[in-house]
Amino acid sequence: MNPSHDLQGLKKKAKETFLYVLSALLLGIAIGAIDAVFGRVLLFITDFRSAHIVVLLPFLPLAGLGIVWLYRHFNETAAKGMTIVMEAGQGKRESIPLALIPLVMAGTWITHLFGGSAGREGVAVQIGATLSHAFARRFHFPDNGRILLIAGMAAGFGGLFQTPFAAVFFAMEVVVSGSMAYSALLPAAIASFTASATSHALGLEKFSVLLSQTLSLTDTKTVTYLILFGILFGLTGRLFAVLLQKVKQFMGNVLENPYKRIGFVSIPLAVFLFLGWNGRYCGLGTNLIAQAFSGGELYMFDWILKLLFTVLTLSIGFQGGEVTPLFSIGASLGFVLGSLAGLPPMVCAALGYTAVFGSATNTFLAPVLIGMEVFGVENGLAFFAVCLVAFLVNGNRCIYTAQKRSFW
């Protein structure tokens, strides 16, 4: 052994760790601030659209044409969104265009303003990944900045939802299913917690629900129902992922011109969104989530209609994420299943909220942690069991088609 050589190696490792920690801290602050702006504007837009749905929804086709023009005029590659992020994380792509950040924010705001059914979390993840990857390349971090890219994804997720534990594991497990990027754990944790604290300090509120009931896993009937629910939630997430991929392919083949695709198809989309209880299925789906956890009115078909409208909205070129609609789909389905089975509907809604998301994104630890961060740890074992079953039956499908699979 050479003590001086070992000491040099230790110093090099300490310097590298310090640079990652400092970078993650700075990126967490920046991404958390952007998340706060993006999230607060989106909430304002949601309230404004809800109050003026009759006036705004007829302009959905024109809004779609505007989104296509923005991407084609400024950076068409950026329209690939999460696919670019995944490819960069897997080393298949050298860079992510910085234009993605303003384009995806503007496109998502426009989509929601005029009534499209879409989410927001995927947008935040793209923002975090793009900014962190550009930072890593600018300062010549190793491995094409992959570690900081994962940290940025965690910051984007954690900053918008303020579920930092779940955000860390989502970023670590989503790029390559079945393989955890443990080398990114420390930077991802620092970036995620910093972004969460920053966005909260800037006025973005966390969604959380205190469940008053706890499921007993010692009761055979309850366990049987939970296994059945896990299967149904897993199949629902799988259905969403498969339909999203197939409908995108179909629309691209039938209407190759993006202007015609979004212009023509969004006309009947707007009509049906309006006929669906005056825009009940527009936007994020937070209205359905609120109904599920306040004991409000939910219909047996809410989950499937929200699923179909979201798939169609995203398949023709509108912008926005998938995660919040997945939460609303799962919560709506879980509430109905719980009511039918005689189990606490709100607890079952929470299980659906997490498990459908986990199935559709082909992740396991992230949805379990979301359940405990949003709804409390009291039903932690139930979240674990249901999310595990959903993960196992989803058939390795994922809404992010560029996700790599290391097993199955």
Give the ranges of each region predicted by the language model.
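Alpha-helical transmembrane segments and immediately membrane-proximal extracytoplasmic
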Residues: 1-408
